């Protein structure tokens, strides 16, 4: 009985801590089939570890030992924080979605680097003292045409 109560409280806390989902620009972007077959899709990074088994490995081979010295900066983004950054960006339909410190989210065009939109859940500053390891997070999750974000 005690275990069931603790489990119910934990699930409730998780649900309460989640913010409303944010819409992706293109409906139907992520589904079970895409997540399970992510290893065969080298154009996107749909989840935290890229593949369903969380290997965090990119199969792209356009950059190699012979041409790496000729690379130049295509674009960069200022994440507007001096705090830690631990989130893995998602790449879906040519857009990069990244969460930063304080659970803020930004969407960029992957080719141009243009900021498409940003979201600030307005996490109270006093929350920082409650976090064990700074105000970082592990990123957003995508399902269907929405992004999901857990906040402090």
Regions found by a protein language model. Give the residues of each.
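Bacterial N-terminal signal peptides that target proteins for export
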Residues: 1-6
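Repetitive helical segments and hydrophobic/amphipathic motifs
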Residues: 11-13
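C-terminal motif of bacterial Sec signal peptides marking the signal peptidase cleavage site
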Residues: 15-17
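Aromatic (tryptophan-biased) beta-strands that constitute blades/sheets of beta-rich domains
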Residues: 22-79, 114-129
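Repeat-blade elements of multi-bladed beta-propeller folds
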Residues: 45-49, 84-104, 129-152
